[in-house]
């Protein structure tokens, strides 16, 4: 596993790109999506500014490797969460279903799709935010 300071640095580089997207930030965000811990930490930052976060997540998705369905599914599910957070349930529904098509065995996309289907998008955003903020706090407490 990477040393904690390297994880923190990847997160900080990615988070800095949410409002000022750059190649470096997109690259760091892609690295964040390779580990659940960093993905969740970055989710907290994306949800801090959901509108900019949604645009940034779409940048990252376009840059993501098409040959890595697990990562693509996670990114697509993230877009669904951010779409809910910005009051776009239509986009959220499309993204949630696409995520489960891309990665049918991935837990996060599956949860996002289930909660979207039963009309619990807002509740899901709260749950994701709570978990993500806890993960971010722990990452920086070490």
What does each model-identified segment do?
Residues 1-142:
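Charged, compositionally biased boundary regions
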């Amino acid at each position: 596993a990477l040393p904690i300071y390297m994880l923190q640095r990847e997160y900080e580089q990615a988070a800095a790109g949410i409002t000022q997207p750059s190649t470096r930030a997109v690259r760091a965000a892609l690295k964040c999506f390779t580990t659940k811990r960093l993905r969740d930490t970055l989710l907290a930052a994306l949800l801090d500014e959901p509108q900019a976060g949604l645009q940034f997540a779409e940048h990252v998705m376009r840059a993501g490797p098409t040959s890595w369905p697990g990562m693509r599914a996670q990114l697509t599910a993230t877009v669904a969460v951010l779409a809910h957070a910005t009051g776009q349930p239509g986009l959220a529904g499309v993204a949630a279903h696409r995520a489960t098509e891309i990665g049918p065995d991935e837990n996060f996309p599956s949860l996002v799709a289930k909660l979207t289907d039963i009309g619990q998008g807002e509740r899901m955003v709260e749950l994701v935010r709570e978990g993500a903020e806890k993960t971010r706090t722990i990452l920086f407490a070490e």
